[in-house]
Amino acid sequence: MLDRLRAAWRTLTSPLTTGRSIAWDSAQPVSRLKDWPPAPSAPNAPWTNPSVLRARAQHEYANNPMARRAVDCLTNACWGGNGIMPLFRDRGVQALWERWARACDASGRLDWTAIGAVLLQTVIVSGEAFVILRLDEAAPGVPLSLQVLGPEFLDESRTDDRTLAGIRYTGLRPAGYWLFKQNPTLSGASLESVYVPTSECLHIYRPLAAGATRGQSWLAPVLIALRELDEYLQAALVRSKTGALFAGFVRSAEGGNPLSQAGAVPALEPGSMVRLQPGEDVEFSEPPPIETAFDPFVRAQLRRIAAGLGIPYELLSGDLSQVTFASGRAGLLEFRRTVEAVQYGLLVPLFCEPVVRRWAEVARAVGAMPVDADTTVRRWVAPEIEMLDRRSEILTDLLRVRAGFASRSEIIGRTGWRAEDVDLEIASDNVRADSLGLTFDSDPRKTTQQGQATPTAAEQEARS
């Protein structure tokens, strides 16, 4: 037994005793990995040349339909048509917030929902955004307004012993930002920058590494794939259009190149006959066939892009031809986790909560609400991703409520409604139905789940 243990030990330690070292295959300096950067990158390495990445991402969003669809899909899922709304404990505070949220944009054009959508779209495309919290007497109820700025407003030329690329630090924490008064990308814009403390400016970005102080475009991993796929599709379209012209060419037996003469190049039109010289031979163009692997190749590239963005392929492409109920449900479940990570890991802590805190401070300072008003947010209501089988979702929620695992307020809140408002509407509907002598299956006072009349108290007593 002792000999076997010694032999096993020698086997395990042989690389050390023979002078050889244990190494990972992925770290070997082999030729096929020569283009793989061997040195680790710093957390803020992407920002050594931020304008190029940002400009390319913005260009693809403006011109590439797949890039536009990807950004809109993430924005709609994470922020939605109603945005992420706070539910306050105090109904008076809630009413004051809802009044302010309808016109809280510094430009006077957008509401809370639209501002959040613009903010998230800017963060996805450009990697980061700034929100200025301005004191504004024109804002309804509470004199505070919001202004969303892109990363190009940061004056990165400002650098000293406490300022790095336009961001001033106190220890490890940012203390403020040097921001241009006007968009520096506009012709004739002033390049004067002003210092804005963090109490009046929010910096919204998703750090991709520990210690990252700036964000990068979420499109960065797929920018090349998006552009090259778009170029491939455009080339295929041009090739098909050219082939569809089906032109005929008259070939001269005498040779020569009449097309070399100035102004002799004719336009190709469907059914046209291009005369080269008087003469002999007619030759028809042969339209190039569409590759048999065209659709599989495009689908593979779109799946790659969707994976890089964390979006189901079906939502990115709109192609539902290969979706089954099980695969669609599995994809939506994973996408829901991605969306919730953005909602509760980025938007709520970095944007929604700081805005509510500042809004409450200003409201108390100007007397818009009592000093002792309860501004506690009971719940943040985010847009819900509906599943494929809505019936099973509702039954699951019903069982959770009946088992005590969830409250009606929680279930209703996920739909964007307040439980109190739903209860008031139900009570109002019941009063109106009773006055008109109407009975609905949705009224448990009068019908059971099976649609039968609910026994009255006298009938129940008689049965017992």
Q: What kind of region is each of these model predictions?
A:
Residues 1-12, 329, 346-381, 385-464:
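C-terminal anchoring/interaction modules
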Residues 1-82, 461-463:
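N-terminal-proximal low-complexity accessory segments that begin disordered
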Residues 13-32, 252-263, 445-464:
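Intrinsically disordered, low-complexity linkers and terminal tails enriched in Pro/Gly
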Residues 62-209, 400:
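Structured, mid-chain assembly/scaffold modules that mediate subunit interfaces
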Residues 109-132, 290-391, 395, 440-443:
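C-terminal amphipathic alpha-helical
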Residues 112, 133-135, 239-245, 316-320, ...:
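Short coil/turn segments at secondary-structure boundaries
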